[in-house]
Amino acid sequence: MPTMNTSMQGKICLVTGATSGIGKATALGLAQMGATVVMVGRDREKGEAVQREIKTKSGNEAVDLLLADLSSQESIRQLAEDFLQRYTKLHVLINNAGLISLRRRETVDGLEVTFAVNLLAPFLLTNLLLDVIKASAPSRIINVSSASHEAGYINMDDLQLEGHYRYLRAYGQSKLALVLFTYELARRLQGTGVTANCLHPGFVASNFGQNGTGPISRAVVNLIFSSFGISPEEGAKTSIFLATSPEVEGVTGKYFVKSIPKRSAPITYDESLQRQLWEESARLVKLPMKV
């Protein structure tokens, strides 16, 4: 497993959800290894404070901040445009941002917010940045899923959960979908020098519900996670491992727990479902149905 002595000098890494929790710990770890870290956050004031903190703690000035609302497809497209205006390479993309919403809400695009942020945002951002990721090969795409995917199931006729909404059902579905997306992406990227893997970070004691509903809902979610959760630093270890370790050079289409490849839920290996979900995701974000 890489240590903080592992050099990421010259590598450009983009981390979503980088202003708190696992994302913040991941961004700090990569900065300490010498990477150029591009943080993605939603709030400028908070983002700039975390940016300064990471620069100070890491001694690395190459820490950038881009702002985006990952529940908005327009904002995601602007994020990709902003990145491509500043950078010509992207060696590591970590789709870390995620949320739980205790009640059903729709985004500005009319989509259920958990599915939109936890799956469609990574799907859209990855595809928008894919050309520069390929041009930077060997490069890595890392999707932060959850063991909760094992309790999830997907009804392709009701991905937006319009029939009956339960927040754990919505979360499990979104994280299951993220594993399916990862495996389909890995297959489509074979031979390009780009790998795609996903992971369970552990149940992390952090402000996970920050993008959920109101303060009471956030408090409930945070209480659940903080009562038995690990630290964000511990939770970031597998993301950092997949981003930096020579041990996983060329390894793709895998699900990792504690930096070890594990079997994901049986349904995630259904290639027909992987393709079907890809095509529906492409339709929902208005992308051509190809890499």
Specify the residue positions occupied by each region the protein language model found.
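A glycine/serine/threonine-rich, flexible loop-to-helix segment
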Residues: 159, 205-223
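Rossmann-fold NAD(P)H-dependent dehydrogenase/reductase core
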Residues: 1-208, 286-291
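A short, mixed-charge helix-start or loop-turn motif at secondary-structure junctions
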Residues: 16, 163, 167, 221-225, ...
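A non-catalytic, amphipathic alpha-helix used as a structural packing/dimerization or gating element
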Residues: 46-49, 276, 280
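C-terminal helical subdomain
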Residues: 174, 198, 222-263, 269-275, ...
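Short glycine/threonine-rich loop-to-helix capping motif typified by GTGT followed
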Residues: 210, 267-268
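Hydrophobic alpha-helix feature that most strongly marks membrane-spanning transmembrane helices
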Residues: 190, 213, 244-247
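A short small-residue
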Residues: 31, 218, 260-264
